[in-house]
């Protein structure tokens, strides 16, 4: 796939403006193509980042810690790959280490990388969990994402208070219900 130039991308924005009945040469829209491209570069910056690079910094001196570690309430905004409309919500991550841990900010960075791509919530849930599982090789990973989807509120069925929840478990969380319950009870108290 050949990546379009910045000028080609700006022309595509002008084409979309004409498609919806706007005049891209009117004063209020003259700089819009450039602004859209700048915002897309920021919004979709996850494509230029490698999650495994973030997960390379591990700590092996865990004092034999083999209990639940969680980071709750990680806010995100992403864009659905079907309509390129935003969906935003909260991610809760937990894992039980085997012999290493990562810095707490790394979990939030993982969410940032995957949410700054065209996504569907189900795929993002799996990607976050599997990247942690692959890198840290913990006893298990648990993820819950709750999100509001603009493609449900701005178009189609027009339901603006619907929340979509996805959960994904690996290892001990997938195998033993008691660990899933511990995770869900832990985040329910939030």
Curated annotation (Swiss-Prot):
UniProt binding sites for Zn(2+): 80, 83, 151
Record bears the keyword Manganese: no
Gene Ontology annotations for the cellular component aspect, listed alphabetically: cytoplasm
EC numbers: 3.5.4.16
Gene Ontology biological process terms from the UniProt entry: one-carbon metabolic process; tetrahydrobiopterin biosynthetic process; tetrahydrofolate biosynthetic process
Keywords annotated in UniProt: GTP-binding, Hydrolase, Metal-binding, Nucleotide-binding, One-carbon metabolism, Zinc
The keyword Transcription is assigned to this record: no
GO molecular function: GTP binding; GTP cyclohydrolase I activity; zinc ion binding
InterPro entries on file: GTP-CH-I_C/QueF, GTP-CH-I_N, GTP_CycHdrlase_I, GTP_CycHdrlase_I_CS, GTP_CycHdrlase_I_dom
Enzyme class per UniProt: hydrolase
Pathway this chain belongs to: Cofactor biosynthesis; 7,8-dihydroneopterin triphosphate biosynthesis; 7,8-dihydroneopterin triphosphate from GTP: step 1/1
Reaction(s) catalysed (UniProt annotation): GTP + H2O = 7,8-dihydroneopterin 3'-triphosphate + formate + H(+)
Top-level taxon: Bacteria
Family: Belongs to the GTP cyclohydrolase I family.
PANTHER family to which the protein is assigned, alphabetical: GTP CYCLOHYDROLASE 1, GTP CYCLOHYDROLASE I
Subunit relationships: Toroid-shaped homodecamer, composed of two pentamers of five dimers.
Protein name stated in the entry: GTP cyclohydrolase 1
